[in-house]
């Protein structure tokens, strides 16, 4: 089972809490998630931290995965500045 989550144009602190809750729900039900980051124009470090923690939590739980697809240039640039490209499995 795979579901998609679409990040809004402004993925900031207000998005971090609900995103974390969605990840926890998916992990507990064994549901894989795909996070579409194509619309992101601005992303905050708290939101990126939740994504990194989510990647780690899904990996530890096994059975389900978290994939980030189509990161916008703004998303990729912020992740790069913060040194999170590898943690988010986005390469360079």
Task: Give names to the regions the model predicted.
Residues 1-46, 52-92:
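STAS-like cytosolic regulatory interaction modules
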């Amino acid at each position: 089972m795979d579901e998609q989550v679409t990040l809004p144009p402004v993925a900031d602190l207000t998005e971090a809490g609900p995103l974390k809750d969605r990840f926890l729900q998916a992990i507990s039900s064994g549901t894989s998630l795909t996070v579409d980051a194509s619309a992101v124009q601005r992303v905050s470090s708290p939101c990126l931290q939740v994504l990194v923690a989510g990647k780690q939590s899904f990996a530890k739980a096994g059975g389900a995965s978290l994939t980030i697809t189509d990161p916008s240039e703004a998303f990729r640039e912020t992740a790069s500045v913060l040194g999170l490209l590898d943690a988010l499995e986005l390469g360079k």
